[in-house]
């Protein structure tokens, strides 16, 4: 792993896990419709920590209902479903009300993607200081929250 703090980039040259491949499939759809930042536990897994997870948390920008419908239709077309609701109006309403919604591969609730709009100013800032992770073997990139933000979140919010 190489970290360039000035460029806010990490280069990973490792084989992908099945979770990594699923994340890439999901994110390739998300990034066509919205900016995003992966946050929380999967970040440490991506960077080499060996632990299990049931979900991958991410913020997406606060997009319009029309853009969300396009995103949701593409997710469904690619085999994902929403665990919270089926109708786009309902799912979007959850997001607008500050709640997270979960998507997974159809009929496989785990692992899933917990998607949310940023609520607080500190959530919105994750987009400004995100780090780009290059997965060289997959020729792909993922945006994660900054390492400093990850540490602060774990220490002060989760108390771990």
Residue ranges of model-derived segments:
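Compositionally biased terminal segments of proteins
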Residues: 1-160
